[in-house]
């Protein structure tokens, strides 16, 4: 057997994951671990409650926020083309974000603002420090009420999909003041939607087309996109929301993903398979793998957060690191911080559909898990913690 994992460890990993399906945590899942050239895939359960057919390795899942690093890679490709740079003001392509004003404090009325001290840059957007993002207690703030009235959704995955087009969405954001001065504070999520629209404006083509031609086709990601074609809908898993009475169906195979969305959302709109995700993660692990340059990968994995960002957003970062460009990254101190074997380590991210991916350069372990159960918190679920604990224990 290859040296990446122990046979007993992989058996224990399979038992752990199938156990969560057996107890009803999720209807089904597909997980992959890879180390030292050895790949092991676990499939368990079915694609929907009440479906007696076993889930296949080619099952299609809503990957939610695992979309973010993929869109980040597309931006880096455009940077390599010379079409834009990290230090460029985004208003060159997104004039809706020019001349920003900033709330004096988060609970201020919308007209209680001051001028932005500088323009928003491409790096600000990709590092989630452009001045706007998820408000964790939205009911308390006038700006959150205005956001909801416009139809923007910055908390959680983009479900149900917005009826707004990319142009309408960015125009709506442009009508709101920023929450912080550009470049001063990390706020989750919204930067990824902006990044997707930025790709469209810079490339002069729809985001779905840019991703297909620049990322998916070169990497052989044949089942990844913003909707599922008719001939593949039978492979799309159903999505469930956990509650006191068990799992409630949120979206089925012929629901939101049966047709292209009005807004291809860079924050969480993609569907994919375990093998497509492995192709993307392997590209990054190979320092770009011939798609991205080594320098682009280095820039994506460079932590941009401050200690204040880490403290304020501990629910996102845990004790493991910070944020690079469109994904979580390990920090120098991360190795001495963690005591929980289930904490995701390395670079990657997690999704609101229960998905998780990390590549840990320290151990060479890559793990990916795709599920169909919506998260109830930004913190890792019990299933996610158990997956990472078992995956690490399986390493030889």
Tell me the role of every PLM-derived stretch.
Residues 17, 37-39, 62-90, 192-200, ...:
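Active-site SXXK
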Residues 40-42, 352, 357-358, 364-373:
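Short, well-ordered beta-strand elements
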Residues 341-347:
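Short, hydrophobic/aromatic-rich segments at coil-to-beta transitions
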Residues 373-396:
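Generic C-terminus detector
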